[in-house]
């Protein structure tokens, strides 16, 4: 039997949009964060070379050590020292976000989310038994999206474990600042 938290999740509206646009040449496929461009040749060639070398087995759990070292060096150069041991490479962004949610949230914890937002960001906490409180963006007089910061802060409680602020925001394009 499927858990109630899963059964009660709303159907994905993004999937509805994608289904309506799939196969249409006059529509750009932005619904899944995809480009309308084919993957560049150097990346396709590197993938083919990797397959030809027989690199088809499971990798290290946290990602290839040399990739984690490169990411750590890049992050260190941008910000502050980051050890490769603190880096985990995932197969996709949604996997990384779910791992983060699993590390931070338990049943009864609270998430305060700026909405509208990509539906997976609010579905993940719900799957884990956390409560999601939504704080809406609203258009100002010029039609630009704005966040009511006092309203956001008023929603934070001692049970709040995660503050979800997606910027640049999907789907509005709103940015912090």
Which residues does each PLM region occupy?
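Active-site phosphate-binding strand-loop segment of PLP-dependent enzymes
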Residues: 137-177
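Short beta->alpha connector loops at strand-helix junctions that form conserved
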Residues: 115, 134-139
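Conserved PLP-anchoring active-site segment centered on the Schiff-base-forming lysine
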Residues: 86, 103-125
């Amino acid at each position: 039997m499927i858990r109630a938290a899963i059964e009660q999740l709303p159907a994905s509206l993004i999937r509805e949009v994608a289904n309506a646009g799939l196969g249409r040449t006059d529509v750009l496929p932005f619904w899944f964060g995809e480009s309308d461009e084919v993957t560049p040749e150097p990346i396709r060639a590197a993938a083919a070379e990797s397959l030809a070398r027989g690199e088809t087995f499971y990798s290290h759990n946290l990602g290839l050590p040399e990739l984690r070292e490169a990411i750590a060096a890049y992050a260190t150069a941008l910000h502050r020292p980051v050890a490769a041991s603190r880096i985990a490479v995932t197969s996709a962004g949604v996997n990384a976000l779910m791992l983060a949610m699993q590390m931070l949230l338990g049943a009864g914890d609270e998430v305060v989310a700026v909405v509208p937002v990509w539906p997976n960001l609010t579905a993940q906490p719900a799957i884990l038994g956390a409560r999601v409180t939504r704080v809406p963006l609203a258009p100002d007089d010029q039609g630009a999206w704005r966040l009511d910061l006092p309203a956001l802060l008023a929603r934070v409680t001692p049970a709040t474990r995660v503050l979800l602020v997606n910027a640049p925001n999907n789907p509005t394009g709103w940015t912090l600042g």
